[in-house]
Amino acid sequence: MEKLKGMKNIPINVAADLLNKSPQFIRIGLQNQRLPIGSAVKMSSQWTYHISYEMLKNYIGIDRINEYENKITE
């Protein structure tokens, strides 16, 4: 898997793993602007999501990201 820092958009399921929450929690949090890790935009009837590496890092800390990356490469 590519390092999170190199990703333009962190996948919902990765953010959910990092925060120990469900993907639905992440989606709703972004839709309601409760999670300061990215944005959600409604396009017609579907939502699109952007999770920023920098915003996620600022929210949970680099140590948690490093721990996650080490875990998935074992």
Regions found by a protein language model. Name each.
Residues 53-74:
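A short, Lys/Arg-enriched interface patch at domain edges and termini
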Residues 20-50:
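Major-groove DNA-recognition helix of helix-turn-helix-type DNA-binding domains
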Residues 1-29:
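Polyanion-binding surface elements
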Residues 8, 12, 31, 62-65, ...:
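Intrinsic-disorder/low-complexity regions
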Residues 2-5, 18, 39, 52-54, ...:
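Short, low-complexity interaction segments enriched in Ser/Thr/Pro/Gly
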